[in-house]
Amino acid sequence: MTAVAEQTGAWLAEFTRQETTEPWIQALRDAAFERFSKLGFPTTRDEEWRFTNVAPIARASWKTAQVSGRPIPQEALQHLGKHAPENAFSALNTAFLDRIHFVEVPRGQVREEPIEIVYDATGADGQHLAPRTLIVVGPHAHCSMVETYRGTGKYFTNAVTEIVAGDGAVIDHYKIQHESPEAYHVGTLQATLGRSTNFSSHSISLGGALVRNDAGATLSEGTEATLNGLYIADDSQHIDNHTTLDHAKPHGTSHELYKGILDGRAGAVFNGRIIVRKDAQKTDSKQTNKNLVLSNEAVINTKPELQILADDVRCTHGATIGQLDAESMFYLQSRGIPKREARSLLTYAFAQDIIDRIKIQPLRESLERMLFEKFRSVKP
């Protein structure tokens, strides 16, 4: 028996246990499971996964849990599954489509209050969850959305979010991941953006034993996209962020800032790709990845990438890896601040500009409290 067959056998048993559903949904499920069966789980021999070993997910036997949401409406058919990448984890999520959070914001509507979705895996020990979110924002509509992932015990969340934005829309998307320290989390976010759309994504990764975030956006003419990310890993956590900004049309602008804080024996990966297509002249794109490493055993692998096929563009990228500044530590301690507290203050200061970019005040304040508490436990 091949490795792929061994991995997919247990999933086939779970797949066939699902209740029958609408024919069009079943067709999506069947096609997705066939794709997953052919692909199998990625391995470290795959370039996109060379620093992240998903064997603990692939080898485990998971029972399927029902996730929050509502039955899939017919009107979701136009976009569901049309935007997420066709990789193994996205296929696996689609194969277990059951309920969905489907959000439609009509043309010109301005939603003043954020739309909040909580995927709570409390009590899901030993289970697999496949949350699915589809957000369709009409032309010139405005909305903010917050997705929160949390839970207790050892479980596997495999989430997919697709965002479709009409011309001139404004979307702020927030993903707050503070899963159980024993949990596995694979999340895919893919946004397809219309002309002159303004899109921002804020990814905060705090929990999970093994985490992979894939965030991508395809830009049209005059689109502005911003990707902000903060990942904090300690003990033996592993957090992998892969991002793709695809400038498909001219006059697009993108800004990306991802920051990581690593302690203990933690590992992290950042792979950020900016693609500028041949027709995407006058593109302006900047990508930055900064990492703060607090221990000798923590490891970060960072790889910013530019793929430029146009000639009239302005694109920059860079990555840094550093430690706490010794002079700043000395300055704080010379003013009577204990070493542990000084370390905590400087660590928070490193993360603060990401937190400050969060426009929803209650969410920003909640994260500030969460980070203060987390950094209080940073070892001196």
Give the residues covered by each predicted segment.
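N-terminal amphipathic, basic helical "cap/leader" segment at the start of enzyme domains
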Residues: M1-H101, P106, I115-I117, L257, ...
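Conserved beta-strand/loop scaffold segments within soluble protein domains that form the structured core
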Residues: A31, H79-I337, A351-P380
